[in-house]
């Protein structure tokens, strides 16, 4: 019964998760299951857990019992327990702490038996061996963390004579040279050259040659830049330039034998520019041309044409006969017709380039002529020479005299760069410093002071601005493009001048230019100041422009003023008087003001002219210091239809006589005491009882110019007065008086003075008359001015009008002016 039960139960298949634990074979082998055992066995079974309730990851560490075979006498190190969420990071930290504890334990154990030194020594040897293995491999070996690599480099740098340190410096030199060559261009070549000289180019000349050749082959348009760089270095270190040239010639010969047209073209282009820089002799250029033209093929002709375009200008200047021979050979090849049509066309284009004198292919482009021809060292290397390319210079090789050679190059570097802070002359006996000339030290300062007196850059800038303006559809596009033009600092006025000049060239004024100027003025203060400066310049030189250009320029500035693009204070340069204006300047001001009135209206313009803050700037346009200038300005603005802006001047002109009379009276009263002594002799000889002294006027009349004045009175006394000029008479005729423009002796206060300008009735009440030409205070009594005649003349019966009279009816009788008269003047004649 029990056996059958066991057989029926045991073969029953169960899932692994539900199968009970199998009883120990040792305990069950001796006996079989009993009925009492079966319930006990079933009671031990428990339901299996749900797989979904299981944890996502197994426990990170199992607790195991201590191994029975562990030696209790051995020193035990407890593994550190680090709490961290990230298991990988926790494991790494635990390992690091464990390694540290082990090292500390080893150090403690070695204090007594001297094992510490052995441990440290073995660690240093291991690190050095690993670093040597790293340096010996071309690929750099396995990855080393940066911190560990820096530690290894610092360990190797302790001994500068070691191969490890030399390898580190070699790798740094290679990276530095490659980086500097890859970023050189026309604009920064002057900054790259000192940095290159800062590296040891004598030790790394192979690296430099390889790097510059690779960079040139990958970017042919930069060939002139690389050639200029080699030329500069060749002046100081000729062995570097010679090595570059030798490798180029060797590379050209190999490429020509292999029919590699691409390499031939790149190498020949580099050689051509080295010839242009006088690093290579022209004989190598001629050899290359003859080699390509000896047995012409399509590829050789293409290489020869490309080479000739680069070196043609140099050969035409230095070897004209050989240059003509080469072109004769080109012509013969063209006439033979054994090459393709494409190559024939290339030769024809080459002849056209020669006819144009290589204007698109200059020998030395602008900005790369950095070495004087006398300072350059030319290497005479030909295609037939046995060349030593020195490929071993590209590879690292330990130098037993590394420190001494570095010190020698540092001395050369100080001589080249002119570093005055370091000691100089300590290595003057070295083989490198003997090859340097003292005159070469001044190359960099001389080049820094070169000035382009031809103003080529300025012409190119103006051309760019002109083409940009002409190619724009509207003013917004023009401003947008002009803002992208690279205008040098301080040259902003050139853009303003070009906009104005383009505007002046139009047949009629176009508002397109005015809107451009307005937009620029409102973009930045720099452009506002530039256009204000341009206004003053064009106002001073406006007489040089013809009428049409003058009109366009005037309307342009009128638009800027009306739109507040520039300040109205720029009108301070305008002085509206007869002496300081010309016909061109008056027309210019008229056009400017008319444009302003057209856009703003006369009322707004008049209001702006009356702003108190701007009145000092308009003092020249609306003068109120001199009635003559005020009258001129009033007439000018009235004639151009802007009489409304002259109201202040008209008011001033009406009040001017009263103010002037008050000033003259005060001045005459203050100086009346000094006039008695000077007028005594003239009073006794004068027949007119109310005439003043003329002695002061006669003595100073030789120095001042006087004008004649006429009286408005028709009373029996003489009715006309004259202003004598250059009077030399000691005494005036009777009943006449001389008056000087600049009297130096005071005269007694006058009673009354008449102005002929305001008299319009036969017998008006006495009025005062003002002379526009008189600029010094003069008393206005009822006195008459005399001529320079030495005998009295009978008084005329009719009055005479002065020069400034504006009476509508002319006088019936006139009298001549007698200037510098030395004889008695005849009585006046009727006309």
UniProtKB/Swiss-Prot annotation:
Main location: cytoplasm
Region described as Disordered: spans on this chain: 1-89, 414-450, 670-831
Compositional bias (Acidic residues): 433-443
Chain ranges of the MIF4G domain: 174-357
Biological processes per GO annotation: mRNA splicing, via spliceosome
UniProt keywords, alphabetically: Cytoplasm, mRNA processing, mRNA splicing, Nucleus, Spliceosome
GO-annotated molecular function: RNA binding
Biased composition (Low complexity): 1-17
Comp. bias intervals (Basic and acidic residues): 73-89
Origin superkingdom: Eukaryota
Entry's localization field: Cytoplasm; Nucleus
Pfam families, alphabetized: MA3, MIF4G
Any single GO CC term annotated in Swiss-Prot or TrEMBL for this entry: catalytic step 2 spliceosome
Keyword Cell division: no
Domain spans labelled MI: 460-576
SMART domains (UniProt xref): MA3, MIF4G
Family in the record: Belongs to the CWC22 family.
Function: Involved in pre-mRNA splicing.
Subunit structure, as described in the record: Associated with the spliceosome.
PANTHER family in the cross-refs: CELL CYCLE CONTROL PROTEIN CWF22-RELATED, PRE-MRNA-SPLICING FACTOR CWC22 HOMOLOG
Protein name (Swiss-Prot/TrEMBL): Pre-mRNA-splicing factor CWC22
Organism classification: Eukaryota, Fungi, Dikarya, Basidiomycota, Agaricomycotina
